[in-house]
Every structure is written in C-alpha cells, then in structure tokens.
Amino acid sequence: MTDTTIRARGAQAAGSPAGAGPLDAPDGAPRAACLELDGITVTFPGVRALDAVSLSVRAGEVHGLMGENGAGKSTLLKVLSGVNQPQAGTLRLNGLAQRFGSTRAALEAGIAIIYQELHLVPELTVAENLMLGQLPNRAGVLDERALVARATAELERLGERIDPNTPVKLLSIGQRQMIEIGKALMRDARVIAFDEPTSSLSARETERLFRIIHALRADGRAIIYVTHRMEEVDALCDRVTVFRDGRRIETFESVADLDRDRLIGCMVGRPIADVYGYRPREPGDVAIEAKGLRGPGLAEPVSFSARRGEIVGFFGLVGAGRSELMKLLYGAARPSAGHVELNGRRVSFASPRDAVRAGIALCPEDRKQEGIVAIASVADNLNLSARRHFSPARLLLDARRERELAARYIARLAIKTRDADTPIGALSGGNQQKVILARWLAERIDVFLMDEPTRGIDVGARAEIYNLFYELADAGRTVLIVSSDLAEVIGVSDRIVVMKQGRIAGCVAKAQASPDALIKLALPR
C-alpha cells in the first residue's frame, strides 16, 4: 500500500523514534526549516503581487496557505516553481540560496507544484507522463520495457491499479492527480506544494489524497497546502499562514489551538461576523412546497416548504440526497411519486426550461461543468437564458440589448472582469457564480436553488455572495441553499433542513442551530 511504503521509507530517512512529533527532530527539538523565503517581492505593471514576504516551511510538516483570491498565494507558488522571478528577496533551500530560471531548474532542485489545473499531456500514456523529461533510452531509442517497468513500480508505490499504457485522457481527475504526485516523487522532490487540490475531487478521492499527504509528511517532505477550506486545514495542516493583498499577515503556529474567527479576520481584514452579515426578516406566504416527493437519490418521500423572503439551508453528508432533491425541483430529474406546488399551484416540469418559465432556477454544484460555458464571454454566459425573450428578426437590436443587460448586471453585482467580452473561464470562482446569479436575475426568478454556491470561493467573495442572497430574500424571493459548510449553513440560513440517506432527518430553527445539533441529525445511526 502506498502510504505504508512511503511511511516506511520516511522512517528510515528521518530516523525518528516512536513518539516523536511530526515537527520534531529525533532528539525532540523542532525540525529545521527546509524552505525559507526572506523578503520576497514580485511586481507586475501597476501591481505588487508579493510585498516583502518571509516564510519558512519545515521538513515533515504540512504548512497551509490561506487567503482570498489575489492575496498572493499563486504568485508565491510561481516563485517556488521558477515561473516568476522576484525583484527582491532570497529563497533558500536547505540553507542554500537559490534562484530558479525555469520550472525544470526548480524541479531539479527538489521543488514540485501540483497545480489545480493539472499539467499532464492527455494524449500520452500514464508511463510517458510519469517519465516526461527522463524517458529511458538505449542508444537514443526509447526503451519502452524500462519505461513501463519504472512506471509500474511508481504506480504500485502510490497504490494505483492503473495500466501504465493507458492514455491519461481516459483517467479520472483523482487518478490524474496521483500521476502528478508520482512525477514529483520520481524526481525525489522534497518540497511539494498543492494548489487547491480537492476542488474537483470526489469525497473518496479526497480521502485518498489526504492519506498520501500524511504519508509524504511522515517521509520528512515539506508540504505546502493552499486551500480555502477550514476543514482541510484541521485535517491536514500543522501550521497555517494567512496572506492578504500580497503580504504575509500571520502564521498560526498550532492548528490544534487555532482561533478560526481570528484566522478568517486576518484573511478578509474584518471580523468574522461581517462575513455572514446575517439579517433577519419576516417571511411571507409559502412559495414552494414538496409533498411526498420521491425520485433518484431519495429513499423515502420528502416533504418540506419554504416561504417568500426565506433562506432555507439544506445540510447533510455526502449521499444524503440534497443535490438530487434540487434536481427534482428544477425538472432535471423526474419524480416517481409526489409533487411540487409553486405559490399554491401544483406544477410538473418535463425539463429545466419548464422550471425556469415557472420561476425556479438552479445554480449547480459543478459550476464549471454545468453552470457556465468556459470559453464563451461573460456577456454570452449572462444572456444564455434571456435570449429566448429576444427576437430573431431583430438581431442587431437584440445584440445591443444583450450588451446593455450584461453591463447592467456587471455593475449591479460588482462582477470583477475586464469587460463583458472577457471569457468567463478567466474569472475567479466568485465572479463566475455572480454571472450565473445575474443570468437568473434577468429572468425574474422567484425561487433560487443554490447547490454548494461558495465551493472554491474565497472568504471575501463569499461575503458578497451572501449579501446577494439577503437582497433576494429582502425582495421576497425564496433561496434554498445546499451547503456542506456547517458555519455557512448556520450563518446565512433562517432555518435548516437536515437530510440523511435520502430522507429528511429534521428541521432546525436558527436559534437552535449548532454544529453538534446538525451533525447528530446528519450521522447515520
């Protein structure tokens, strides 16, 4: 098994006795810094991306990096990988000053970056990707037998049962990520940085990644872990450093004693209460009601209602049926029993288009795959639904109307984009989510179904999204929020429906909502 293999090698390399802490040397003293940054400054025209940043990472630790988008985390990784050259400051690796002119130079020195967008060649095989840059050859001819043998050995070390001759394009995201990790290990990288590695992984793939990272840590490697997710910091990190506006704000030396409110305050530059900014309101009549609804993912009939001006959270563990329920409400799946009522009238949707016409819209969990057309412009994405109102006979006028509509909502929702023609794929996750919301605002939607609306979005952008939800509720709209983030679902919801194994386990009023109460309802008996 991979983690056992890596741990065994790590114990031999580090010589650590039983009972030594992860950051301790064999004699119990703290391990020395493996990587040191001193006064690193990176500037671009008109922008100081990193401002005199100093940071140390120890061998045998997982060091978390947190901060909003634009805080400087990605620039720091690019300095480590040789993509960006600092204008000032020193980078030391094992006490020796280094300056990398290329990613190859950084990798040869022992630094590997596992980016969010994986850098593999889809058309090449697993073996070829693992060995890129060091393909075995005999007299200048590729030694395929040696290639496959070395790749097979590495896959076994990772615990991956993959045919090394498989083209990478046929692998899952989780499998591709393991190939990236394998590449780093084959080059004996002692510093490995992960950039938001779980953003596209399933729960099972995430669990497997965490086991690998724990094993790498036990092997004495220095791990840098960039994330937005507090639960990942709790599960993995020994220390965590917060960045804001290109500066290192603070390093928290013990995650076990971490003050979450203080950490989030460091990230956004204001108290945590301002992040959720909850404001109560008096709800109106029932807007949407499910009565005995059955369908894919639901083990028992589901019944609930939500009122105008109300924000209802849906919490549960993976497989609880929350996303499946949203798809039934949206017409993306057909119920096998029960029905939905909208404003007191029974409705039935043959497709999502029918739901939108009736006033129900969904912002999907997989924003990039189901919510946007990444290569299309912000304006095109914003107008995807509204175009059905425009007249084919008046194309020029309607093109003008589309641009006016896009400009209006870009301003109204403070969407950060160069202009309306910018490809939406170039925007941050928070701004992509705003474009999806703008699309439905242009449709005069009454019921908004939000499935994991802030996944992969930094804390500052989350606050803006939450404020949009409050504005919708203040205007009498109904917002249903599926969220796996306990603090979020408690912080923004008027009440919370807890689902478990395809059924509703209970409904909790805001005054009684606590992490313990929700978890107890969500856990299988």
UniProtKB/Swiss-Prot annotation:
Its EC number is 7.5.2.12. This is Arabinose import ATP-binding protein AraG 2. GO terms for molecular function: ABC-type L-arabinose transporter activity; ATP binding; ATP hydrolysis activity. Part of the ABC transporter complex AraFGH involved in arabinose import. Responsible for energy coupling to the transport system. It is an enzyme of class 7 (translocase). GO terms for cellular component: plasma membrane. Residues 1-25 are annotated as: Disordered. It is a peripheral membrane protein. Belongs to the ABC transporter superfamily. Arabinose importer (TC 3.A.1.2.2) family. It is found in: Cell inner membrane. The lineage of its organism: Bacteria, Pseudomonadati, Pseudomonadota, Betaproteobacteria, Burkholderiales. Residues 7-25 have a biased composition (Low complexity). The gene is araG2. Signal peptide: none annotated. Residues 35-270, 281-524 form the ABC transporter domain. InterPro entries: AAA+_ATPase (IPR003593), ABC_carbohydrate_import_ATPase (IPR050107), ABC_transporter-like_ATP-bd (IPR003439), ABC_transporter-like_CS (IPR017871), P-loop_NTPase (IPR027417). Keywords: ATP-binding, Cell inner membrane, Cell membrane, Membrane, Nucleotide-binding, Repeat, Sugar transport, Translocase, Transport. Pfam families: ABC_tran. The complex is composed of two ATP-binding proteins (AraG), two transmembrane proteins (AraH) and a solute-binding protein (AraF). ATP binds at G67, E68, N69, G70, A71, G72, K73, S74. It catalyses: L-arabinose(out) + ATP + H2O = L-arabinose(in) + ADP + phosphate + H(+). The keyword Membrane applies.
